[in-house]
């Protein structure tokens, strides 16, 4: 059986985390040549490339499996040895989360864990359709995703759903939709998307108004909080989680443009199995709060 030296695995992990050999060397306090040598040793052991040497580097399929193994071992080591050998070093937990969860329910869910446990969070923000891929690549140990099926050697639990409403300010609604939300009016109304892969707004308009993707003018803004600000100041209409704008809807700063029509995104919590003690705490906290504030039906 091929058993890797975990120093070489840590070099591979550092290159991926730091997005390059030079910064990985600085992180590990060794030379760049030493990083390259360790990864070469690992590749010789397994007889195949473990890195695609692009900018930034990315792991091959076998590299992803090894990184996942490393992260599982680190968590299990913490469970068995952490209190005795590394009590002064907070455990690093890398999680992939979507921006809307981060802006709404996720941080309150993690609050009791952050207060009671010595951990450092590395929250990697990604669209909920792509967070599971970061878990597959071994970049994180847990992910909030819309995928309901677990990866091999992983666990999954349902968290609940975010319901997205199509909203705008009253002044925006009066300007662009004086006769209600119609197909022709939507073609003139500025909207906003998180990035070029964010298809929620387009999917909503296609499903309910038969508008083809790309037919509506759309800003690109990588911030959930900015969506709310843009809508409040009357510059765009957009899809925002109901949970994020309850106050604005109640005081009429924002209005639901299409009552009864919404987009529902069911969210699931994925993580490696077996769970360490610390990851079990994270899981319990996320499920407890998620089941409380997210839609369960």
Curated annotation (Swiss-Prot):
Record has Protein biosynthesis as a keyword: no
UniProt name for this protein: HTH-type transcriptional regulator ArgP
Gene3D superfamilies assigned: 3.40.190.290, Winged helix-like DNA-binding domain superfamily/Winged helix DNA-binding domain
Lineage, broadest ranks: Bacteria, Pseudomonadati, Pseudomonadota, Gammaproteobacteria, Enterobacterales
Family annotation (Pfam families): HTH_1, LysR_substrate
Hydrolase as UniProt keyword: no
Chain coiled-coil ranges: none
Gene that specifies this protein: argP
GO MF annotation: an example: DNA binding
Species whose genome carries this gene: Pectobacterium carotovorum subsp. carotovorum (strain PC1)
């Amino acid at each position: 059986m091929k058993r890797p030296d975990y120093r070489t695995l840590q070099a591979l992990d550092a290159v991926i985390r730091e997005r390059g050999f030079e910064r990985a060397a600085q992180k590990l306090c060794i030379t760049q040549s030493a990083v390259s040598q360790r990864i070469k040793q690992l590749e010789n052991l397994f007889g195949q490339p473990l890195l695609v040497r692009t900018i930034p580097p990315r792991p091959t399929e076998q590299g992803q499996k090894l990184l996942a193994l490393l992260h599982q071992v680190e968590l299990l080591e913490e469970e068995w040895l952490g209190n005795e050998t590394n009590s002064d070093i907070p455990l690093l937990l890398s999680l992939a989360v979507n921006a809307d969860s981060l802006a709404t329910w996720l941080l309150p869910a993690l609050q009791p864990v952050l207060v009671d446990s010595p951990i450092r969070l590395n929250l990697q923000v990604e669209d909920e359709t792509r967070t599971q891929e970061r878990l597959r690549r071994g970049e994180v140990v847990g992910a909030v995703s819309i995928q309901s099926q677990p990866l091999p050697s992983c666990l999954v639990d349902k968290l609940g759903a975010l319901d997205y409403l199509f909203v705008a300010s009253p002044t925006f609604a009066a300007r662009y939709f004086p006769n209600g939300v119609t197909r022709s009016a939507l073609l003139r109304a500025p909207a906003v998307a998180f990035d070029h892969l964010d298809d929620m707004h387009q999917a909503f308009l296609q499903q309910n108004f038969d508008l083809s993707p790309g037919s509506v003018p759309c800003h690109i803004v990588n911030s959930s909080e900015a969506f709310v600000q843009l809508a409040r100041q009357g510059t765009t209409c957009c899809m925002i989680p109901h949970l994020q704008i309850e106050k604005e809807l109640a005081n009429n700063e924002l209005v639901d443009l299409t009552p009864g029509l919404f987009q529902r995104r069911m969210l699931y919590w994925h993580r490696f199995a077996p769970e360490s003690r610390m990851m079990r705490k994270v899981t319990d906290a996320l499920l407890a709060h998620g089941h409380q504030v997210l839609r369960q039906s």
